[in-house]
Amino acid sequence: MIKTKFGSIVSHKFNNQYICYDSSIQPILKDRILASLDSDEFRLSNTSNFLDLNNGLIKKHFCRKGAMHLFNDNYFYYGLKNTRPIREQKNHMDFMNIVKNSKNEWVTSKLELCMPIFSYVIRSNLFYKGDIILSKITGETLDKTLMKRLKINIEEEVGLCFRFLFDNGVYNFDMNLTNIIYNPESDKLSFIDFDKVTINS
């Protein structure tokens, strides 16, 4: 059991594999999650970091960039709670609770939350590889939205959402235009990629 600020993450170990999910959805998803480990779809190799599972879910595979790309998708293992999939899952869960418990009605109606379904870690001696399965968010990244000018006052709305993040102690050290999704149909914004987030609320 891994504690978050507002709940906990349940982990199951199978040989060298760990499957982890929100304790509050355990009765609903446990069987489906465990069954997914044997699915051909889940074992598809990821060449582009993100893989659309075509069922309302997105699989994010963690891989290195920059000078560390020689390690590819291998990371040093310092305990399950310190792995990147668990860290991102925990941050998503805490952020969801902050938004849901907020009294700021404009923000709660404007933000569409990306839900972490479960995370998956494979350990091999000193290293691990990992994935996280997230609910699929419809829309386009903010850089494409700004280029198309889909919404005139989008900058102001993004600024108000940033203010909400800072007021609640949510700091994303990897925030950029590709980590913000705008859905023109619902007129909602979503923040994604919570791997490098610190929450001090």
Question: What are the residue ranges of the model-derived segments?
Answer:
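Short helix/strand-bridging catalytic loops that position acidic/His residues to coordinate divalent metals
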Residues: 74-79, 145-150, 195-201
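Conserved kinase catalytic-core helix
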Residues: 91-112, 140-184
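Conserved protein kinase catalytic core
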Residues: 66, 141, 199
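Conserved ATP-binding subdomain of kinase catalytic cores across diverse folds
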Residues: 27-138, 167
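Hydrophobic "anchor" residues on beta-strands that sit immediately upstream
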Residues: 131, 170, 189
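Catalytic activation segment of kinase domains across protein kinase-like and atypical kinase folds
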Residues: 174, 178-201
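Juxta-kinase regulatory segment immediately upstream of eukaryotic protein kinase catalytic domains
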Residues: 1-44
